[in-house]
C-alpha cells in the first residue's frame, strides 16, 4: 500500500511539473514577428495573439539584391484553422516603398472588406472584417520597419 501511495505521489508531482512547464512556455510566446533583413531568406515565427491563441508568421524573401535591405518580401500571417492573410512588400533603403497583392483564405467563416494600405514609409496595414457565424471582428496584419527589421503582428 505504501508503494502505491508513493508511486501515486510521484505521478502527481510529475504531472504538476509538466503542466507548469507547458503553461510557462505558452506565456513566453511573442506577440510580434521580427524579420531580420540582413539575414534574409525565409523566416518563420510562432506567436500568441491577444486571446492566447497560437499563430504563425512566415516572411519570405522574393528577390535577392546586392544591397542589404532592398528587395521584395512575402508576409503571411496564419491563424491555424481559422484564416491566413498577407501581402507583398517592396523595401528600399530600410523603408517600405510599396505594398501590393494582398491575399487571404479562410478555413471557417469569411473575410469581408479587405483593404491594404501603406500608412507611411515604415508601416503597412492589411485590414479586414472576419465573420464567423453570429460574431465578427475587425482584424488584419500590420508590418512595420524598425531599422533593418520588418516587424509583423496581428492588427
Language-model features, listed with the residues they occupy:
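Mature secreted bioactive peptide module from preproproteins
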Residues: 61-155
Amino acid at each position: 500500500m505504501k508503494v502505491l501511495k508513493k508511486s501515486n505521489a510521484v505521478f502527481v508531482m510529475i504531472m504538476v511539473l509538466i503542466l507548469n512547464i507547458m503553461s510557462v512556455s505558452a506565456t513566453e510566446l511573442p506577440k510580434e514577428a521580427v524579420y531580420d533583413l540582413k539575414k534574409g531568406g525565409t523566416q518563420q515565427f510562432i506567436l500568441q495573439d491577444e486571446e492566447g491563441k497560437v499563430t504563425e508568421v512566415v516572411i519570405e524573401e522574393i528577390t535577392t539584391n546586392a544591397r542589404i535591405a532592398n528587395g521584395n518580401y512575402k508576409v503571411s500571417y496564419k491563424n491555424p484553422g481559422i484564416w491566413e492573410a498577407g501581402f507583398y512588400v517592396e523595401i528600399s533603403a530600410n523603408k517600405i516603398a510599396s505594398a501590393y497583392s494582398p491575399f487571404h483564405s479562410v478555413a471557417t467563416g469569411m473575410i469581408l472588406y479587405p483593404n491594404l494600405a501603406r500608412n507611411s514609409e515604415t508601416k503597412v496595414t492589411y485590414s479586414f472584417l472576419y465573420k464567423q457565424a453570429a460574431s465578427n471582428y475587425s482584424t488584419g496584419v500590420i508590418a512595420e520597419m524598425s531599422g533593418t527589421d520588418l516587424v509583423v503582428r496581428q492588427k
